Amino acid sequence: MASILLVTNDFGPRAGGIESFVIGLLERIPVGEVVVYTSFQPDHESYDQKWLSDYQVRVIRDKSKVLLPTPRVIRELQALIRQNSITKVWFGAAAPLGVASRWLRKAGATRIVALTHGHEVWWSKIWPFSWAISEIGKQVDYLTYLGSFTKSALSPHIKDASKLIRVAPGIDTDHFSPSDSMSLRQRHGLGSRPTIVSVGRLVHRKGQDRLIEALPKVLESIPDAALVLVGEGPYRKHLDGLVNKYDLSGNVFFIGRINFAELPNYIGMGDVFAMPSRSRLFGLEVEGLGIVYLEASSCGLPVIGGSSGGAPDAVLDGETGYVVDGNDLTAISTQIVRLLSDAKLRKEMGERGRKWAIENWRWEIWSKEFNKSLDI
């Protein structure tokens, strides 16, 4: 019988960074140990059935599209805990659902673990959300953090520092490995052109606009350079406008959304990976970690990352790549040119990045730490 209740808004079939993090940990918990309580999504039936068939994980869908710690939801969770003799609760994201911890303990939960991501950082900066983080910290046994940046934001609100433990998303270093993507390059008309690749949702914070704006300076030194943007999002129209403004239609290639299985090959199209992320809204919207930097390192590419939030935790500046100010076009273009002009440097940084990913970021490392927090 299951002993762990996972409560989360971030679950499939919808794709996303937090969803991948939660699912990666769930797949590495012993079979039959977990019941999932999550929000409603359309066309979820076959997805939920696969969890039951493959992992003996029962998925229960609430009627709402977004779970909040309302009295109704708390009653549903309490009933699940009592009916299934559940003793452990795992929150896929501490905010906001972790606020329910106090009431779940009354129902019989004896151990509660909550993950944090990027959004808890801005919660920690604004009252009454900062108060909620403090309350969650009081009630849970462990509150995870991604890296030094998220820890520094959370620490002032958590009286018992021993409750803070590091659990970050893992990398499947077998899946994300160096690959020969020449056929893919040929398909997209790139051939052997020096290529920068960026993967991520097309939004302001990810810095695709700055890559386009920095490209004319790159082209002064490397006239045939190409920029490949993988992903989709609301910023696409603005990015199209920048391509037209700088007359870069022959240099910028929009790939759109791709399947997870194809991602390593698309990353491998690049000679350099770049995502100069930047903070927004006076530091309230930041990069929590930037798992895609680590995926690119695992694929053997040197990485240029932005200095937003926790992104520097994912790039060893000067070793696996460079960390730049995501608003500094000169810094962005300078590091791109440096890497595209020096095959030996690219190879050395790429090899160090792959080694670092294997030694420090594999799923086996982080899932072991997480399972220990749940006492399994």
Where are these regions (language model features)?
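Conserved donor-binding/catalytic core segment of Leloir-type glycosyltransferases
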Residues: 5-7, 144, 190-206, 212-216
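Carbohydrate-associated surface elements
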Residues: 149, 170
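Conserved acidic donor-binding segment of nucleotide-sugar-dependent glycosyltransferases
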Residues: 316-318, 322-329, 338-344
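Acidic donor-binding loop of glycosyltransferase active sites
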Residues: 251, 257, 268-286, 301
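Short hydrophobic beta-strand element within catalytic cores of glycosyltransferases
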Residues: 293, 298, 302-305, 315
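Short His-centered aromatic/hydrophobic patch
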Residues: 91-97
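Nucleotide-activated donor-binding/catalytic signature segment of Leloir-type glycosyltransferases, i.e.
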Residues: 237-262, 272
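A short helix/loop element that forms part of the nucleotide-sugar donor recognition site in Leloir-type
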Residues: 177-190
